[in-house]
């Protein structure tokens, strides 16, 4: 089967745009939402598709309450994938790859292959920052493409969307950032005040488990616009040399997104 990448023409770069992926979950009955967060997408899928959704994240299940169609698992993703007995015909990953190291993603995709039903569909939505931000974040699009191509079996097609968007804010000076290994830099994007509060809670929780480090007291900052919360994975010894970074440094200026749809008629390992 061809594993081609082609222009898809859908916007995947804002909070509203991510709901496009709900359309691609229609027709499936056993759906897994990895990195579900508040459960907003899980609920939208369950209500629109009438399907049962298993939602997996460390916590924050606001929108999954009182829904008979959603089962929420407060677990690490790879822990869940390696222990669950459930099988799924649709697996959703919305905006989680940028929070994970390459090694974690490799293991996650390997685990996913063990829980796929025949004719399974994998839906991956991913926002990422454009070149205007320089090397402080994983700006190279090929990282996401190669992670998918190299760690998942071939499917019917891989569909890819890229849409630049200009936001208000100040351009960054890449000289403000020194000594950062940006290839494996982990970050999380917040689109609104509610998600910003959730991201801060998640950061504090991860920090309490010694999974990451926090810089510039981000967990105490109010929401001031479309923002990036920097997280450093504990497996990499990274640090900021310039400690006088301006507050505006993590306000996003330009960003893009991608949507990947992979359909399987049979699973090849």
Where are these regions (language model features)?
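Class I SAM-dependent methyltransferase Rossmann-like catalytic core
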Residues: 1-18
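Class I SAM-dependent methyltransferase SAM/SAH-binding core
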Residues: 38-79
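Conserved class I S-adenosyl-L-methionine
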Residues: 29-37, 123-150
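Conserved Class I S-adenosyl-L-methionine
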Residues: 201, 205-207, 215, 219-265
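A conserved beta-strand element that flanks and buttresses the S-adenosyl-L-methionine
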Residues: 92
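Short catalytic micro-motifs in class I SAM-dependent methyltransferases
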Residues: 95-96
